[in-house]
Amino acid sequence: HEYQAKDILADFGVDVQRGMVANNKDEAIAAAKKLTEETGTSLHVIKAQIHAGGRGKGGGVKLAKDLTELEIIVNQIIGMQLITPQTPPEGKKVNKVLVAEDVYYPGDSEPQEFYVSILLNRGVGKNMIMYSTEGGMDIETVAENTPELIFTEEIDPVHGLYPFQARNVAFNLGLSGDAYKGMLKFITTLYNAYVESDAS
């Protein structure tokens, strides 16, 4: 589940969206109150926890502006049969949600969503970073229609990630200032988590 993956990444020092898993509306409200104390915002993202991607487009990820909205959304999502392109035709039943802080990458201008992943390129037998300025939810469509908007960095299997490759990622994403520095740290810690947890 997403919440478990985030716990693993956080253990390696990767900055992740804060959140807590909830099995019912009471747990969700308690989680939201605690997150509001920690973050100062009453905006929360409610995310269905199933083993499939495409949850947002299937109605399994929603923004709650207050506790009343949160309760309504949690009641809608928990127990639903969530159908996404990655589930069987009948979907998967949602038994829990992640109540998470509403975040954007802290850029110098308007908030923007990026896609970043580290994966094993089986064709060349090397790990690589794949990334794009064209957000996370529609990356398959981006790859199909505008592949020139997807960048890659092949990682040397002996040396590992070179510092200039992390800089390439931040530069190609158009970042500057604190956002640029933050992305360097993010890429480095994400790569370390990938290697140390043997995620390939």
Q: Which residues make up each language-model segment?
A:
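Expand to "…catalyze enediolate/carbanion chemistry for C-C bond making/breaking, isomerization
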Residues: 4, 10, 17-18, 24-29, ...
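Gly-rich Lys/Arg/Thr-decorated short loops/hinges at beta-loop-alpha junctions or inter-strand turns
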Residues: 8-14, 54-57, 148-150, 161-172
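ATP-grasp fold ATP-binding core
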Residues: 2-9, 36-56, 85-107, 116, ...
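Catalytic core of tubulin tyrosine ligase-like
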Residues: 16, 68-87, 169
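Hydrophobic alpha-helical hairpins/lids featuring a short glycine-rich hinge
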Residues: 88-155
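Glycine-rich, mobile lid/loop segments that gate access to catalytic sites or pores
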Residues: 154-200
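Glycine-rich phosphate-binding loop of ATP-grasp-fold ATP-dependent ligases
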Residues: 16-19, 46-73, 115, 138-139
